[in-house]
């Protein structure tokens, strides 16, 4: 690895501000980013850790709307009782992602932002007609997922 500036954001607003510095990348579970950095496929100037931001964690169900925070682990998605009732297929799918280590560290936000063609969440979110909410806007899943490893995320989101 190489030198990188590490920041633990105290809020979503601080994370967004730090994301503007240099070639910063968000970090939560690190299941894709850290291996990419180790093999020098990614070389961010700054890592902005959002893994402990409560605003980005957890599952909320209100009527027919399910909201899952970007820093919510696959394990937490798979074991949330409210989600198991509201959308059992999504909870079950999350329980089958990777191995226990990946399920306990990997996050739904990281999986979605990476848009790996082998990942489960993109297809599930497309099928559900989901909306991805960033710090700046709301994006329909069919507009968010552009192609292999490509999303509709813009700089600073």
Spans of model-derived segments:
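C-terminal structural segment of proteins
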Residues: 1-157
């Amino acid at each position: 690895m190489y030198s990188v500036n590490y920041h633990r954001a105290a809020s979503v607003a601080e994370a967004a501000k730090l994301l503007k510095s240099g070639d910063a990348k968000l970090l939560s579970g690190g299941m894709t980013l850290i291996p990419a950095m180790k093999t020098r496929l990614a070389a961010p100037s700054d890592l902005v850790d959002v893994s402990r931001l409560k605003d980005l964690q957890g599952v909320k169900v209100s009527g027919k709307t399910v909201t899952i925070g970007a820093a919510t682990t696959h394990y937490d998605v798979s074991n949330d009782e409210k989600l198991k009732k509201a959308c059992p297929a999504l909870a079950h799918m999350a329980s089958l992602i990777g191995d226990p280590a990946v399920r306990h560290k990997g996050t739904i936000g990281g999986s979605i932002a990476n848009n790996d063609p082998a990942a489960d969440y993109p297809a599930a979110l497309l099928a559900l007609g989901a909306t991805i909410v960033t710090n700046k806007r709301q994006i329909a899943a069919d507009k968010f997922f552009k192609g292999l490893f490509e999303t509709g995320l813009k700089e600073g989101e």
